[in-house]
Amino acid sequence: MRTHYCGQINAELAGQEVTLCGWVNKRRDLGGLIFIDLRDREGLLQVVFDPDQKALFETANSLRQEFCVRLSGKVNRRPESQVNKNMATGEVELLATDLEIFSRSEPLPIDFNQQVSEEARLRYRYLDLRRPQMNEKLQFRAKVTSAVRRFFDDNGFLDIETPMLTRATPEGARDYLVPSRTHKGRFFALPQSPQLFKQLLMMSGFDRYYQIVKCFRDEDLRADRQPEFTQIDIETSFMSAEQVMEITEQMARDLFKQLLDVDLGEFPSMTWHEAMRRFGSDKPDLRNPLELVDVADVLKDVEFKVFSGPANDEEGRVAAIRLPGQAENVSRKMIDEYTQFVGIYGAKGLAWIKVNDRSAGREGLQSPVLKFLPDEVIEPLLERMQAETGDVLFFGSDKSHVVAEALGALRLKLGKDFELVSNEWKPLWVVDFPMFEVADDGSLAALHHPFTAPVNVTPEELKANPAAAISNAYDMVLNGVELGGGSVRIHENAMQQAVFEVLGIEKDEAQEKFGFLLEALKYGTPPHAGLAFGLDRLVMLMVGASSIRDVIAFPKTTTAACVLTDAPGAANPAALQELGVKSIVKEDE
């Protein structure tokens, strides 16, 4: 139907006849001529219609925005005065000789020249995706997946599919359940990840596996979450954690170099404890220069219980952030707003000190908490914070996890508000995570998943002191975004049983849910390790989008609905009866 894409037309084709297909992006009449900008996935091209060709000109006169057409004509150089340097094809235009209208368009229900709500964009997604900026994002995504496949194919990995219909596993979120018609009363679950199947593939001898795979989680949504998302899934046998990190880091470096011409360099490594201590986050944005500094030892003997209480509590922490040179710009109103902000993360308040004159000691400071601080702690505190004239110090004092979350979030907000974040790429590995975390009910939960191997402990030692166990896990972080997470897996039956026991999973329950895995672990399981990247999140970061919905063709809303197709919808009663399922929700609920 066509010989070229619009975006391929350039001065080298001047004088040639070409045929193009696409949509009318814009139409204008000027000096007795009709001009249109023809658009396809590769770009725009100006087309001109000569009034001397009466039949063609009459047809062109009926063209309106978003008509879908085929055009043939001769490529001409534009006069120098008419060259449009804002268009990639701005040196040339097409003098039309033939026009076929494939289909006409009614007036568009949305005007993309104005601010359009996200719901409207999703409702008319097929129109939204015609916009060049959306088209470019999805084309970029396609380039990412192609580059990923090439990399793993070239490195001896096998692309193997795993089941979409499986059984529920405890991976931290609710499952999407699929009722079985042939096994009434029983349900499949859509996979939250291919975790267990890829481990079984290692046990089957496929020592290098990868898959670009859909995963499903029924959870509350945020800007970087979707109920269905795409994962770059990797698993290897006979490779150490360091080797897995090395090959996946190389993949990331190659990807950024090929597609963005960005050299990420070697990734530094940081322990989880260091990340939480310095940045209040296990996915720190290293572009932000602000850090959390511990000051509990300086303030542990003051009479002010807000500081001394947590400073003398084994589970407490007192830390501060130094905001350099902004004392004059930080108003009391801003401090009140920051106090409310940290309250979202559980902080009971936000103490602060302005350093108006570092050389004047106490007299050069401004703060409502100064009256509670004796002279002997002032200088050590300022030295610890490396405070200088014009700085503002913000304090967090509470349980360690509250201080980390509150000051970690404040660090990011201060970095954004005062434009401290550099415009560069800052990758790192976060390693040595705790094996377990304390759940809301006081029980232990796996920080990653229950198939992650601990570092250098026996099953007996793990059960005796699970809180001290370190997992052999690693997360790849870039600019504050977790690109991927992985770990060395448990490959011994006794250790897997021990982890289940620590997690409070009884033997009968473990057998019911994971009997196939425990059985497989009896028959010569190789040491294995892997990692999974969130493809949507990776592309979002690379193209600079604010939400993964901008890099998914047909995403769901924040309520996990598709406004385009009006899904989820009510099921046919006959289909429910055949499945042995009864709806207890009324139609209007």
From Swiss-Prot:
Binding residues for ATP, per the UniProt record?
217-219, 226, 482, 534-537
Which EC class does it fall in?
Answer: ligase
Q: What is its main location?
A: cytoplasm
Q: Name one GO cellular component term.
A: cytoplasm
Keyword RNA-binding among UniProt keywords: no
Which catalytic reaction applies to this protein? tRNA(Asp) + L-aspartate + ATP = L-aspartyl-tRNA(Asp) + AMP + diphosphate
Family the UniProt entry places it in: Belongs to the class-II aminoacyl-tRNA synthetase family. Type 1 subfamily.
Q: State what protein this is by name.
A: Aspartate--tRNA ligase
Tell me the keywords, alphabetical order.
Aminoacyl-tRNA synthetase, ATP-binding, Cytoplasm, Ligase, Nucleotide-binding, Protein biosynthesis
